């Protein structure tokens, strides 16, 4: 007896489960590597403290009342960036953001005997933008002042407030916020033109906040009919220190030192530069004229003593309309030697 084969199911066979032919790989993309550099300056304590004595000026006597030897009223602003008051500290201050004055004492040292007449006064004004005193009565009205005969030594201690202030590195700041006032020196009842004594400043100053060195070159411009405008650097020159006419230009340098001066005069014809007054030419100057511009570079030394003759003068030209200058301190070795 034969057996029947089993009937096939009418249901369609199910397809086999297959694993998708896809693989996932982790690929390391070679990114550029860098380093994070952190600067922690300055440390919590002040980075730099300096105790120094500076010669501020040589006092020249006068019959009538005169302030700062006839220089600008705000010439002696109390800020370490001021080269007239801090001739050496100004370069240290250029490396920092802030300063703090801890000690300030003015000393007058006479150079004349009792046979000389006249008086000298030293004043501290907390506002660096105030005008100079106009009478002898106003001298005693200041919070800190001292007056003496020209042959008698004296000193004035200024109270330091230990407040941090910004070092001024240009002329676009509010002077009341960055200066610790100003110093004023008044002479009267004496003889004109006689050097009576020296004024020294004993100071202790601290700096903090190291920064890239600020400009130590002053850039100035004066246009015909205008006043001297400073754009950069320390105040070797102030607006009253320069004059301009259609045929000449003059400069009075009342901060003692040796300077490198480069000037560009816009004019119709050529001229010449001379050094005189309180200054002396060092070495040889170089000059050239072309395309309505007279360009000169000189090295000279100024004694800082008041003079009615310009320290540097450009003359013999015509059509002078603008003078641009760069001036900075230098050494006598920076001069040019012809030949």
Swiss-Prot record:
The keyword RNA-binding applies. Changing residue 4 to A: Strongly impairs the systemic spread of viral genomes. The N-terminal R domain is rich in basic residues and is essential for RNA-binding and virion assembly functions. Residues 208-339 are annotated as: P domain, projecting. Homomultimer. GO terms for molecular function: RNA binding; structural molecule activity. The keyword Transmembrane does not apply. This is Capsid protein. Residues 1-15 have a biased composition (Basic residues).
